[in-house]
């Protein structure tokens, strides 16, 4: 029998004001009172300084690092500065947590994930998106040892991030369809449990679409729970298949082509509309659901020129070529790409 290790967070703490418990969480989980706290320039003010204050009151020795970008250089810096720490605390958005995730994996120390936004499922997943000289790559990493998601803080972030997180979860639907296709056509390993969890999470969020609003803590809580669940599906699968398919290829292509890309989740949401059309699914419902939460559904709403949308569709199949999707091995012709974007009203 084939056995595989599934990494999941040991503890998940989510709720209003839960960040105040971070000292107790660290005391219960960590062998020593010395940690590296990684933040971003903005997130340090939002939550990082408060985490530092709480842990200093609990007599922790703290090494502070601020990063601007999720690059290989940032990871190397954090690896060097955290090698003697008992854990890394990533306090911030996706870039901060991705760098913290890779550094903790390399140093074989736990990561405590403290997200300040609900923009994508990186807060709980065993994957990290890191930029190198070839672009952005998705790397395997250890899942966070613990996760502390303060919904008060997350709900105060710009609503655009929460809507992007919602969109990222909805993209699970096309991702799983792509995964099924790869299983049928090229016999790629498929996990029924991971796929079921991923799809269930997306459907639960669709059911909650009417209740997702700006500056609303319950809305933030719903999206956070969905992102955590999506991250767990990735852990169960052992790869990002349950949450990343042709729609993510489109988003990554846009990142490479567009001068000013939108948020990852926003691009994946628009990609989901078009890929659902290709898959023969109910793309109109996807579009309607995203509109309910005020997430972008068009090139104009993404703030990206229509030509870049077309070019990203044409180039998308070249992203992670080993990952088979509805785009196939040869991708889309320009005529097909234009037709898909027009039919789904992503372009006019």
Curated annotation (Swiss-Prot):
State which Enzyme Commission number(s) the record gives: 1.1.1.261
InterPro entries in alphabetical order: G1P_dehydrogenase_arc, G1PDH, Glycerol_DH
Entry keyword Disulfide bond = no
Q: Kindly indicate whether the keyword Membrane belongs to this entry.
A: no
Keywords attached to this entry = Cytoplasm, Lipid biosynthesis, Lipid metabolism, Metal-binding, NAD, NADP, Oxidoreductase, Phospholipid biosynthesis, Phospholipid metabolism, Zinc
Q: Which GO terms describe its molecular function?
A: glycerol-1-phosphate dehydrogenase (NAD+) activity; glycerol-1-phosphate dehydrogenase (NADP+) activity; metal ion binding
Which reaction is recorded as catalysed by this protein?
sn-glycerol 1-phosphate + NAD(+) = dihydroxyacetone phosphate + NADH + H(+); sn-glycerol 1-phosphate + NADP(+) = dihydroxyacetone phosphate + NADPH + H(+)
Q: How is the cofactor bound?
A: Binds 1 zinc ion per subunit.
Question: Disulfide connectivity?
Answer: none
Pathway assigned to this chain's UniProt record: Membrane lipid metabolism; glycerophospholipid metabolism
Can you supply a Gene Ontology BP term from the record?
phospholipid biosynthetic process
Q: Name the residues that bind NAD(+).
A: 94-98, 116, 125
Q: Name one GO cellular component term.
A: cytoplasm
SUPFAM superfamilies according to UniProt: Dehydroquinate synthase-like (SSF56796)
Q: Which residues bind Zn(2+)?
A: 168, 248, 264
**Which residues bind substrate per the record?**
121, 168, 252
Annotated compartments: Cytoplasm
Q: Where is the signal peptide?
A: none
Write down the required cofactor(s).
Zn(2+)
- Would you identify the family this protein belongs to, as annotated? Belongs to the glycerol-1-phosphate dehydrogenase family.
Function, please? Catalyzes the NAD(P)H-dependent reduction of dihydroxyacetonephosphate (DHAP or glycerone phosphate) to glycerol 1-phosphate (G1P). The G1P thus generated is used as the glycerophosphate backbone of phospholipids in the cellular membranes of Archaea.
Quaternary organization: Homooctamer.
What's this protein's name? Glycerol-1-phosphate dehydrogenase [NAD(P)+]
Organism this protein belongs to: Methanosphaera stadtmanae (strain ATCC 43021 / DSM 3091 / JCM 11832 / MCB-3)
Lineage of the species this protein comes from: Archaea, Methanobacteriati, Methanobacteriota, Methanomada group, Methanobacteria
């Amino acid at each position: 029998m084939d056995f595989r290790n599934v990494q999941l967070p040991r503890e998940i703490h989510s709720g209003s004001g839960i960040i105040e418990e971070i000292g107790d969480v660290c005391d219960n989980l960590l062998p020593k009172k010395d940690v590296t706290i990684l933040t971003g320039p903005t997130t340090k003010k939002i939550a990082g300084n408060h985490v530092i204050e709480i842990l200093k009151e609990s007599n922790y020795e703290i090494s502070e690092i601020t990063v601007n970008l999720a690059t290989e250089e940032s990871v190397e810096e954090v690896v060097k500065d955290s090698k003697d720490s008992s854990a890394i605390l990533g306090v911030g958005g996706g870039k901060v947590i991705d760098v913290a995730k890779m550094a903790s994996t390399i140093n074989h120390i736990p990561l405590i994930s403290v997200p300040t936004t609900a923009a994508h499922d990186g807060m709980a997943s065993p994957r990290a998106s890191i930029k190198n000289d070839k672009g952005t790559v998705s790397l395997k990493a250890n899942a966070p040892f613990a996760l502390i998601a303060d919904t008060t803080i997350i709900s105060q972030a710009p609503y655009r991030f929460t809507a992007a997180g919602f969109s990222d979860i909805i993209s699970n639907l096309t991702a799983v369809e792509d995964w099924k296709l790869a299983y049928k056509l090229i016999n790629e390993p498929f996990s029924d449990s991971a796929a079921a969890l991923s799809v269930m999470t997306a459907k639960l969020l669709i059911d909650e679409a009417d209740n997702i609003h700006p500056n609303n803590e319950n809305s933030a809580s719903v999206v956070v729970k969905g992102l955590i669940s999506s991250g767990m599906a990735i852990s169960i699968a052992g790869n990002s298949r349950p949450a990343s398919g042709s729609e993510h290829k489109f988003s990554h292509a846009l990142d490479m082509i567009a001068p000013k890309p939108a948020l990852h989740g926003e691009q994946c949401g628009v990609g989901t509309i078009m890929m659902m059309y290709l898959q023969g699914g109910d793309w109109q419902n996807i579009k309607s659901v995203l509109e309910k939460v005020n997430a972008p559904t068009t090139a104009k709403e993404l703030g990206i020129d229509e030509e870049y949308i077309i070019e990203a569709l044409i180039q998308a199949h070249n992203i992670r070529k080993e990952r088979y999707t509805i785009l196939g091995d040869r991708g889309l012709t320009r005529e097909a790409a234009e037709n898909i974007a027009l039919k789904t009203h992503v372009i006019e």
